[in-house]
């Protein structure tokens, strides 16, 4: 389980957020651009540090201002897929997926087995030796997700995970992403601006407004609050 209670002063407002996500659960964050959604992910992953607060993942404390604990990002074992994720264009699909394992000095036979399994699960085996520059947006997205999941993270953070995927392929990719998250059995937080992503991915939905949790609940509960201006416009598209 992930539990966070963090405060960080931003340029226009103070972000003050408390959230929890259970194992196997997907929490989707929505809100206006600049509301603090991606900042929440960056605070959790360790890219940014809170001014104060606590972040715990399972039995581990990742950050505690009171206890002066701040685990480096590379030691948090979090899979963070950015909106503008970057693959290595000069590498093949398999080499991209293996990159993090090589950085961890995992033995080569273990890398080969883990990469092969991840490619199978993401339907990428036939593309293992293809340079990623030749792939479609949906295929590149699957490679990026495979690269995150092969490290067996304890938490998955996805920022606009389908933004680079062709509209015609998004439905199938959304179902595939949902299946992979469920199979991993870890907490997951997704940031999106798309209603279809909410309906296809969210177990719980959270509206962030100027760095605060405005409302949280099931997708039906939150999307039913049409008196909220953002919710109304979000549903109407």
Language-model features: where?
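Conserved ABC ATPase "signature" region
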Residues: 60-65, 102, 109-127, 178-179
